[in-house]
Amino acid sequence: MKMKLFLLPVTMLFAVVTPSKAQTESPFDSVQQIKEVVISTTRIPEMKSNAAASVTIIDHNQIAAMAKIAPDMSKLLGLLTPGMALSSNTTSSRSQSLRGRSALILIDGIPQSTPLRSTDRDIRTIDVSAIDHIEVVKGSTALYGNGAIGGLINIITKKDVTGKSIAGQTSLSGSTYNFFRQKRGQGYRLNQQLYGTVGKFDYLVNGAFGRTGSSIDGSGQFISPRYGLGDTYTTNALVKLGYALSPKNRLEFMYNFYRSLQDTKLIPSAGKYLQKPAIGILGNKDPQAVDEGTRYNHNSYLKFTSRELFSHTDFEASIFGSSLYTIFDFRKANPAQPRWEGTSGQSAVKDRKFGFRTQFSSRLIFSDNAFTHLVYGYDYLFNKTAQPLVDGRYWMPWLTSNNHAPFLQTKTTLWQWLNVKFGARYDFINVRVPNYDVLRNKVTDPEVHVAGGSLRYNNVSFNVGVSYNKVAAFQPFVAYSQGFSIFDLGRTLRAAKADVLSKISTAPVKTNNYEIGAYSDINHWLQLSGSFFYTYSKLGSDL
């Protein structure tokens, strides 16, 4: 078989700057020249080498380089995060675990994961053009509550760092998968950014639009469009505004819109195990089918920060919200494997979140060689999720949850190089389930009417760690942390066999993570890190 595979990226970059100074590099690049970046995902701002945890930082330069050849979040994380599974090259991230377990995905601290009914799309919820850097904290943790049994992935969006009154960038790129399929293999991307600072006000506006060509394998055959990345149109818009109320007080607003839909002339052709693969062929899709993908994902926050609100104490408060609508692939009625009362259909997930976070950060200074950093506060999250069919029927009813959580994180530093960390978080989650009827697989199946009610979860999670940083070439740490998850509760409820909520098994998963590792920095030219971990839970973390 003759194999052919080509990829042709072409990129043009333009810059708009103030007349006083020409711009020779991305304004964000200078930030990445710092040898060690301060991370915030651990809730205590700190260098990753003394965080007593395995942390990976994917900086702006790495993201920009990857975006030229693979502007897809799943591929980027899989290739640049040790311990994370590679992308499946589909829209689904179900198999893309972190240390073998699911991770909690955040955008500027806003949860993208949908625990009441998983979309398996939480990684693909923002375009790479809007991202400044990504912080990955590996291992079970409850720093942000439910869902991080494999770790945390916090996607930090861009903001202006130039100080110029106005600057900008425009990029245009094109690609093709196969020169012999040019009519269907071509794709393109357009990205425009404007940013600047005027007095006390700073701003950044970023817009991106792209289309991928039809996915083609090395032999020139179309890949099946089911859950495919081919023929996908993606739109992203980011707005970030900041205002300095005073030298110590700041107000910041962020809004991000993301859409990714597949519009293809291909239809899937089923394969046969060990004989022929599933492929894509030209054809007309079912008239009942609509374009699959994420129709919208809105994320927004308003944040107030104050340094030295009172003696040696900073304060941060934020309110945030998100709204998501994802549509899955169309399933034609199959008598051998019936669902939805034996009919064709297309399911979706609708998810809405609203929450707030308040935290104080206090420094207790005992001497030059002994001080403690305390972070304490309260988190609240309201979450509402349903899984309807596009035709209006409900496969899973609207579930609502309220999550209240006080927390405390401490970090004590002795002799400037020994760090001892301890943290605790108490989560109280109340999930409200309405009365509902199970959508049967066949009309001849017995009807199941479930009496709704409340599911209550109480969880206390602890973390403790010690790191030693006196010798840059060898900076070891040991750590223990706990996480918990009520992963995909709706999937259990939609297939209920019992008519009373209390008879349905909905136990949460609690994980324990033990870890020993080290960071090494040899004269700033060679940086190494490694760890050994053991994670355990009594219950499985997937269905």
PLM feature spans:
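Transmembrane beta-barrel wall of Gram-negative outer-membrane proteins
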Residues: 183-213, 217-265, 362, 366-368, ...
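Signature of Gram-negative outer-membrane beta-barrel scaffolds
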Residues: 374-471, 486
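Extracytoplasmic beta-strand/coil segments of soluble accessory domains associated
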Residues: 74-114
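N-terminal periplasmic "start-of-domain" segments of outer-membrane beta-barrel proteins
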Residues: 33-68, 152
